């Protein structure tokens, strides 16, 4: 909760109520992890499953939160459809899971681990551009995203010369050219590359047609609508915490 006092003397008390539920899984026949740094949920009327990447077994673990059962789908490690260590995951459905790996490819995998589609993201990167799909919460989090309405994949990039960040949108059917959405720099620290080491990259997430992002060194939240190009920012400072 946050309690503050306005200049007129009135007290403002903002409380956030959180509801949590602990789910205990019994001992399983498969070797699952204690925690999954890469995971994506599937929710529906009769489905409540978390799919996580098991880096030890190079598999996708399906954790059913209702039946408390864990099933495993092994990812191909060799052959023409080989997948290396994952960098991102986005679950569209139980039978359609998009994953990105260290080779800068994105794969569409079904519930049996069969690769149904491959997208080479290197084709959409300029010579001086780096791909930033990452889920290291100590550094930054920029997720892989699949927009089902637009049939597209979205991911963060950075131009190494200009240091400008942009989200690129690649359309699966290739009927449209790649779309580029440039992120606004920080309102507080416009040049985030100077003196912030590994905390200079933005955290990026997606909700529908909105890109939501912030910079780890400050508390403002930024939004960009990819349809209307409308940009907004929320200066999340308080009486007790400055924006930096």
Regions found by a protein language model. Give the residues of each.
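Bacterial signal peptide processing site
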Residues: 2-6
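A short helix->beta-strand "capping" segment at the edge of beta-propeller domains
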Residues: 9-36
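Structural signature of eukaryotic scaffold interfaces centered on beta-propeller domains
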Residues: 35-44, 88-92, 136-149, 198-207
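Asp-box/WD-like beta-propeller blade repeats and closely related beta-sheet repeat scaffolds
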Residues: 104, 111-149, 156
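Short glycine/acidic-enriched loop and turn motifs that connect beta-strands
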Residues: 56-58, 105, 159-163, 218-219
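Blade-loop segments of beta-propeller domains
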Residues: 69-103, 119-133
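Beta-strand-rich domains and repeat architectures in extracellular enzymes and scaffolds
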Residues: 26-58
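Beta-propeller blade signature
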Residues: 164-174, 223
């Amino acid at each position: 909760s946050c309690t503050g006092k306005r200049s007129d003397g009135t007290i403002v008390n903002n409380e956030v109520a959180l509801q949590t539920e602990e789910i205990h899984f019994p001992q399983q026949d498969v070797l699952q992890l204690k925690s999954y740094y890469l995971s994506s949920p599937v929710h529906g009327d009769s489905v409540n499953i978390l799919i996580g990447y098991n880096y030890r077994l190079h598999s996708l673990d399906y954790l059913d939160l209702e039946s408390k059962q864990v099933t495993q789908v092994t990812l191909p490690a060799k052959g023409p459809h080989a997948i290396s260590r994952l960098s991102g995951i986005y679950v569209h459905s139980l039978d359609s899971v998009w994953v990105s790996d260290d080779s800068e490819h994105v794969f569409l995998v079904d519930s049996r681990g069969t690769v149904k589609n491959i997208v080479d993201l290197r084709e959409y990167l300029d010579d001086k551009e780096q791909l930033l799909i990452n889920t290291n919460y100590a550094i930054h989090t920029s997720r892989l995203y699949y927009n089902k309405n637009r049939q597209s994949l979205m991911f963060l990039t950075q131009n190494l010369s200009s240091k400008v960040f942009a989200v690129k949108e690649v359309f699966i059917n290739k009927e449209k050219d790649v779309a580029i959405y440039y992120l606004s720099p920080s309102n507080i620290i416009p040049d985030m590359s100077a003196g912030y080491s590994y905390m200079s990259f933005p955290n990026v997430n997606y909700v529908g047609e909105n890109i939501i992002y912030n910079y780890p060194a400050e508390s403002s939240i930024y939004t960009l609508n990819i349809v209307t190009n409308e940009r907004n920012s929320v200066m999340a400072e308080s009486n007790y915490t400055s924006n930096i």
